[in-house]
Design a protein with these regions (language model features):
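Active-site-proximal loop and beta-strand segments within enzyme catalytic domains
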Residues: 73-74, 102-104, 124-207
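Structured C-terminal helix/loop/strand segments within mature extracytoplasmic catalytic/sensor domains
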Residues: 20-27, 327-372
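N-terminal leader/targeting segments and the immediately adjacent pre-domain N-terminus
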Residues: 13, 18-102, 126, 130, ...
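Active-site Gly/Thr loop motif
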Residues: 242-246, 293-347
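Active-site SXXK
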Residues: 90, 108-132, 157, 218-222, ...
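Catalytic-site signature segments of enzymes, centered on catalytic residues
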Residues: 103-104, 169-260
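Active-site-proximal alpha-helical segments within enzyme catalytic domains
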Residues: 214-223, 260-282, 336-352
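Active-site helix/loop module of the DD-peptidase/beta-lactamase fold
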Residues: 108, 127-165, 224-260, 264
């Protein structure tokens, strides 16, 4: 009996170690490979107003300097860290890269593109194309299953509150959805179809269940107005003055892989964070102000289920994680992050290939965003 008890303890320890293994991605694909190795729709640079101010040490405050020093040490100390960027009211406070990442590298989003999808939906709503966030997705994407994703409201899809059961690891709606979409084996509508035996485990709107199928369903709503890539370019990318081309990974039918498929340079990721702050501050009109404020707010509690994504966060907004202190985070598997503090207009961007130092990332941003 004693030997059996010891065996159980050892097995539990091994299982815990396996579960605790940090998320890891390909360093080559994260630093630009995904934009060339697989089919993408590319969107041009050079349009809109570039509000990002280059690093100027004469403009830095003491707090900027201390925050930059902490970020620099973080990059040096962690071998899996690839990039780091701090922005204070449009000014670059710190910018750093580690090989093979460079200033021209198209850094991959993983799930940070979920938040970009939410921004597109907000623009379609405020432009009068989507009538109400409480409309069912099937009203705009009639091919969706009327019993599952199609019957879910846009608002509940935004909050990851469809109640739909995920069938794959890391929030994937079916097994290996990301890999199969990227490798041109399947298409987004097929992933969401009733052929996949999707089922609802909770009444929609009642529980947060991290499921990338919700993001794919949102991208299908955008097809009624030209698709995700077209609207992302029109409403967002063409307005921020990007330095370099952006690239959306697509499936075999040309549908954007909305839950994990955008590639952009580090500074352009920073510009996307600044755009989000601009919208939340009312610089894009009152409708987008209300929408983005909701997007970055605690709309639904994070259940923090064992083994689930986002254990560091207390709540969820619209396709965006929220911390107890109110800071909002775009989160990508393997250590991709954009931190946003609207009140002080601060942004942090990091990219990685192993997600093994995120506590330090959060601590630095909390420090950076703690004072003006």
């Amino acid at each position: 009996m004693k030997r059996f008890f010891v065996f159980l303890i050892a097995t539990a320890l091994i299982s815990s170690t396996a579960l605790a293994k940090p998320a890891q991605v390909s360093v080559t694909r994260t630093t630009g490979g995904n934009a060339v190795e697989f089919p993408n729709k590319h969107i041009p640079s050079g349009y809109g107003v570039n509000k990002l101010i280059p690093l100027n040490k004469e403009l830095q405050t003491r707090h900027d300097i201390k925050s930059a020093d902490r970020t620099h040490k973080m990059l040096e100390r962690n071998s899996s860290a690839l990039t780091g960027l701090l922005i204070n009211k449009g000014r670059i406070v710190f910018e750093g890269y580690k090989e093979p990442a460079r200033s021209t590298s198209k850094m991959h989003s993983m799930s940070m593109s979920k938040s970009l999808t939410a921004l597109v939906i907000g623009n379609l709503y405020c432009d009068g194309k989507v009538n109400s966030l409480d409309d069912k997705a099937i009203e705009y994407a009639h091919w969706l299953d009327p019993n599952t994703y199609g019957d879910t409201s846009i608002r509940n899809l935004l909050m990851m509150a469809s109640g739909m059961k995920k069938q794959g690891e890391y929030g994937q709606p079916i097994r290996k959805a990301y890999e199969r979409l990227r490798n041109q084996k399947i298409a987004v509508p097929w992933v969401l179809s009733n052929n996949q035996n999707h089922s609802r485990t909770h009444k929609q709107g009642t529980n947060h269940l991290y499921n990338s199928g919700d993001t794919l369903a949102l991208s299908q709503v955008t097809r009624a107005f030209g698709g995700l890539v077209k609207n992302f370019n029109y409403f967002i990318w063409s307005k921020i003055g990007p330095e370099h081309e952006g690239s959306w990974m697509v499936d075999k039918r040309g549908h954007a892989i909305s839950f994990a498929g955008f590639n952009a340079t580090l500074r352009d990721w920073g510009r996307l964070g600044m755009y989000t702050i601009d919208m939340a501050k009312g610089r894009g009109g009152s409708c987008m102000q209300k929408y983005v404020q909701d997007m970055l707010s605690e709309l639904i509690r994070n259940e923090r289920r064992p083994g689930e994504a986002g254990r560091a966060f207390s709540a969820y907004g619209y396709q965006t994680w929220i911390m107890d202190n109110g800071n909002a985070w775009w989160v990508g598997y393997g250590g991709q992050r954009v931190g946003i503090n609207v009140e002080l207009e601060k942004v942090m961007v990091v990219h990685s290939y192993i997600e093994n130092y995120m506590t330090e990332v959060y601590d630095i941003f909390n420090y950076f965003a703690d004072q003006d």
